[in-house]
A protein has these predicted regions:
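Extended ligand-binding groove/face enriched in aromatic
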Residues: 63-83, 100-203, 207-264
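Beta-strand-rich binding/interaction modules
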Residues: 478-499
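C-terminal beta-rich recognition modules with glycine/proline-rich loops and embedded aromatic residues
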Residues: 2-5, 225, 303, 365-377, ...
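Solvent-exposed loop and edge beta-strand segments that line ligand/cofactor-binding
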Residues: 5-6, 15, 19, 71-90, ...
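Well-ordered alpha-helical scaffold segments within catalytic/enzyme domains
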Residues: 34, 94-107, 156-171, 205-217, ...
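Short beta-strand segments within Ig-like beta-sandwich modules, predominantly Fibronectin type-III
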Residues: 502-509
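Low-complexity, Ser/Thr/Pro/Gly-enriched N-terminal "stalk/linker" regions
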Residues: 2-89, 114-134
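Catalytic-core region of carbohydrate-active enzymes that cleave or remodel glycosidic bonds
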Residues: 289-313, 336-386
Length: 648
């Protein structure tokens, strides 16, 4: 438990609950789904990402003693080069790698991190400022364009990496570098007359500062995070002021509205999710963190409204979010196109961050349901099964033009999905006052400290392919504990047995969690069984793109149909209403997965005599089809894919 959380013990009663997530290093994946993915990311993804950073010239920007070379990424109309935030990719890679080190020491990875840290320390300015672009290219322009140039965003990701590396290894060098950088920001920004009253347009440093506070216990770090969130959206806008100081007309801002960066009004007044999707999710994650630390009901209330707006009006069935490429974000409510979906991997990952944080201050299954959806669908689709190829955009329909890439012009997503998976253990359990909240299911063993009681909790399950879960309790001495077990929102029928006896738990369910309070001893078991029928999913009528279409879901997994399995474009399929679909475990599909099989109809394109249109509908012929988990698509032969299928 972090120092700040320890200090909270014995304080005044709080307005809402505060669960403490288990440290990810205390959860080990023993078998099954997440062991396979975790091993791949640790053994393949982490080393190849460092290789790509080197091959693409990213590491060269840290050669502070050399003159800055030609730009690897040109300046865009906004005035931003992707190179402005190269530092953020080092930070996320270090963070992802660090999460693997405590349980799986790797001297080679540590040496690579230490080499980056040495260069960052060497290049840091005397006053603590740290940004490779401005130090090497434009030191006179630092802090002159918070609206466009991502200075604090990059420092935030470096800070997250520094915290993770310190927690994994105990090495303070990187942490101390970043504390000096934060000291500089504290000296530069704030409401005092001699400071700049600004904040970065790309949120990230806010949540990073909370992580730092939980390590240092320094109230200045929490105060700075609070300032950045409180100041956001204050009018007149700081961005207008700094634009005029640069000799620019604020009206020439390329995105025209500060809603792009959620700076159009104070955060507590915002009720609709707008703008750049990743920025929004990072901001809302920080708001949840500050509600947690400051016991701030106004921030929690704002988060609640924003969460309901997102999940009720703007979220893809896969957990993807942000339909538009033009602003990498949101347009209007119910605008959820499939083939042009942007649905950036980073945004889905960040929704996972936010959802998890919300569950710590309000144990509501709707937050955990969102976390589970992105984990098994809209975030996991961002990385290939071999751990070396990626999606930036996660479309829900393709005619074969979408292929995974080994790196990207703007490679923010690879390191983001990597850090999500390598830190996955923290999302499974939380503890509070003799309670253990079980959020997620998957084969693992966890070691938990529940108010001084050591608990070893082991999950045996083939989840998400099977709904049976066995929880084995390991205790050195009997103890009275409450288990709060998440009943997923997709589950309409569940059974729970405790110590060999099935129980009626319906009355104990509160907001999607079943509470079981008993005296427990070593060897006791809880068995859960979640029925997993294949379900047909339909979109709200306002989502015009999905009219007369159906999607398939089984448990938490969303399915798609891929041309590789049916030999034709799935866009020609007509799914027969109420036709049965059968789940089957296919051990040969990319490491093994449950597929869905059924009979449909196919529109015959062979009898059109070269015509594009005619007055009679196409003839239909029987067609067997197979659907695979959405997160596995584009791992095999090139071809079309579709999530929302036409229903006949």
């Amino acid at each position: 438990m972090s120092s700040s959380l320890k200090k909270a013990a014995g304080s005044a009663p709080r307005l809402f609950e505060r669960y403490v997530p288990v440290d990810h290093t205390r959860v080990s994946f023993d078998a099954g789904f997440w062991k396979s993915w975790s091993d791949t990311v640790r053994d393949v993804t982490i080393p190849t990402q460092h290789m790509r950073l080197d091959e693409e010239g990213f590491l060269e920007v840290l050669d502070f003693d050399k003159p800055a070379g030609p730009l690897a990424r040109p300046i865009q109309p906004s005035g931003l080069s992707m190179q402005h935030f190269f530092d953020s990719d080092f930070g996320k890679w270090i963070e992802a790698a660090s999460y693997t080190l405590k349980n799986n020491p790797n001297p080679d990875v540590e040496a690579k991190i230490d080499a980056i840290v040495e260069k960052l320390e060497h290049g840091q300015m005397a006053d603590g400022y740290l940004n490779s672009w401005f130090i090497r290219r434009e030191p006179e322009k630092r802090w002159t364009n918070l609206r466009d140039l991502h200075e604090m965003y990059s420092m935030g990701h470096l800070l997250e990496g520094a915290v993770a590396y310190y927690q994994a290894t105990g090495k303070r060098r990187f942490l101390d570098v970043m504390i000096r950088a934060i000291d500089h920001i504290i000296d530069t920004f704030g409401t005092e007359p001699d400071k700049l009253r600004g904040y970065d347009a790309h949120e990230e440093i806010e949540l990073a500062l909370v992580k730092l506070y939980r390590v240092t216990g320094d109230p200045r770090h929490l105060k700075l995070a609070t300032y950045f969130v409180d100041e956001r959206g204050r009018m007149p806008s700081y961005y207008d002021e700094e634009a005029r100081l640069r000799g620019e007309d604020p009206a020439d801002y390329v995105y025209k509205t500060y809603s792009y960066s959620q700076a159009h009004m104070p955060v507590r007044e915002q009720t609709q999710v707008v703008g750049h999707a990743v920025r929004a999710m990072y901001l809302f994650s920080a708001m949840a963190d500050l509600a947690y630390e400051n016991d701030d009901p106004t921030l929690k209330s704002a988060c609640d409204q924003l969460f309901d707006n997102l999940t009720g009006r703007q979220l893809y069935v896969t957990g993807g979010l942000g339909p538009s490429a033009s602003n990498e974000g949101f347009t209007r409510e119910f605008d959820l196109p499939n083939e042009t979906a942007y649905a950036e991997t980073c945004a889905a990952v960040a929704l996972g961050f936010w959802s998890h944080r919300m569950a710590q201050i309000d144990l509501d299954g709707k937050f955990t349901d969102a976390l589970e959806t992105v984990l098994f669908n809209g975030a996991l689709s961002g990385i290939s099964r071999d751990g070396e190829h990626y999606f930036y955009e996660n479309v829900l329909e393709s005619h074969g033009q979408n292929r995974r890439w080994k790196w990207h012009y703007c490679p923010c997503c690879p390191t983001n999905i990597a850090r999500f998976i390598t830190s996955l253990g923290q999302y499974f359990y939380s503890v509070k006052n003799g309670e253990v909240a079980v959020h997620l299911y998957g084969a693992n063993t966890a070691e938990l400290d529940v108010d001084g009681t050591f608990l070893r909790l082991k999950q045996d399950t083939a989840y998400p392919w099977d709904g049976d879960v066995r929880l084995s309790v390991g205790l050195s001495a009997p103890a009275s504990l409450t288990f709060r077990l998440h009943i997923p929102g997709w589950c309409h029928k569940a059974r729970i047995s405790v110590k060999g006896q099935e129980i009626d738990f319906a009355a104990s369910v509160e907001k999607g969690y079943a509470a079981i309070t008993l005296d427990w001893k070593d060897g006791d078991e809880i068995r859960l069984s979640f029925d997993m029928p294949v379900e047909r999913v339909y979109a709200h009528p306002a989502v015009g793109e999905d009219a007369n279409r159906v999607a398939f879901k089984r448990g938490p997994v969303v399915y798609c149909v891929e041309q590789a399995d049916i030999g034709t474009e799935p866009q020609r399929l007509r799914i027969i209403r109420d036709a049965a679909l059968k789940p089957r475990f296919d051990a040969d599909l990319l490491g093994g997965a449950v597929v869905l099989e059924g009979d449909a109809l196919e529109a015959d394109a062979g009898d059109w005599s070269g015509k594009l249109y005619r007055t009679s509908p196409p003839s239909l012929k029987p067609k067997a089809f197979k659907a695979i988990p959405y997160h596995l698509w584009a791992n095999r032969d090139e071809g079309a894919m579709q999530v929302w299928l036409t229903e006949e």
